Amino acid sequence: MNLTKTLPLFLLVASASCSAQTLVIGLYDYAGLSAKETARLTETAGLALADAGIQVVWADCRGALAVPPAAACEREMQASQIVMRITPTGLPSSNGDRVQHLGKTLATADGGQFASVSVPAVRAQAAEFGIAFDLLLGYAVAHEAGHCLLGPGHSYSGLMRAAWNRKDAEEMSRLSLHLTKQEARKAVARLALAQTAAKM
């Protein structure tokens, strides 16, 4: 019997909050980002999630910083690992609307492991907000990683808001847009549960 599956998620919160939990993100750049843009997006996304107690380990699987063979890109995926695609095209909407979405994640209430971010959509939004493209790209990646940990829902404020506004863009410029405290606790507990299960 696997006891970790019978433990309620909230029982892991106390122990999980004592130390940072690790999330491995396999980055697949199909959009041809420069090394500088890639470095900025990984730094920004890492900082956005670090505030919640999540340490991101990047596996550069495809793109300017990829150095083959990347072991994390080749081995079987673990529960604490996600795939993040950076695409050169727009992303199709699941409900048929014409809104250009920054990203998309295949997620259920239990989370997910596959996400994509659209470079054209991010460029357009960054221009509208008057902020750096690679800064917004980092936040878009962090947002989609959040869906992988939290599920498909959105919040009324912060990193997981459905549609960011200029106030959010100002917070991004200060590197101060984060998960809410409740979201952070849930995300860290999910990672702790995944890592505990992987050891058994």
Where are the predicted features?
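Metzincin-family zinc-dependent endopeptidase catalytic domain
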Residues: 35-145
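N-terminal signal peptide c-region/cleavage motif recognized by signal peptidases
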Residues: 13-17
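Bacterial N-terminal signal peptides that target proteins for export
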Residues: 1-8
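Metalloprotease/metallohydrolase-associated module, dominated by Zn2+-dependent proteases
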Residues: 21-46, 105-131, 135-136, 148, ...
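A very general structural signal that marks isolated residues within well-ordered alpha-helical segments
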Residues: 8, 51, 151-152
